[in-house]
Amino acid sequence: HEEGDASAGTAPPAPGSNGETIVEKLDVNISAAQGLLYAFDSLYISVNGPGSGLYRARDTNGDDQFDEVTKLRSLDGAGEHGPHALRLSPDGKSIYIVCGNHTNPTEFSSTRLPANWGEDLLLPRQWDARGHARGRLAPGGWIAKVDPEGKNWELVSAGYRNSYSIDFNADGELFAYDSDM
């Protein structure tokens, strides 16, 4: 997982200009961030490590500094296959979070998928010979849609090994790339 400080920056006004790039350390007690999204006057942070979960940092007094950091939801997962990217929904009203297959599903308010995960195999299972992800069963990695307050979570897609990020096309269709192996 990634360690380090959260930073914010202002890029020069145009490529090749002499404008100054300004970078400042943010005073938020967060590490191991794998996903960042600024939306709804808040910085949302997907933490993949100690304290894994979805966090929200806000400036509540208008001084241009984050003075409130709230853990919206704990997520049971960490490491290279834990919580990852955050994206704004195509309609701009909610957040999508991507979690790898070592992140257990959280409690969902609703789901677009059947909840009766099946491990029915025609042939005997062949676990990874190197031992990776042995015992990790369906639904695998998953993608959820979350309201800005972090209260309502809808499972929208699952079955991934370790998708790190997603995006949407102009029609609002979701695209994911299943990383590794």
Regions found by a protein language model. Give the residues of each.
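Beta-propeller domains with acidic blade repeats across secreted/periplasmic ectodomains
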Residues: 1-181
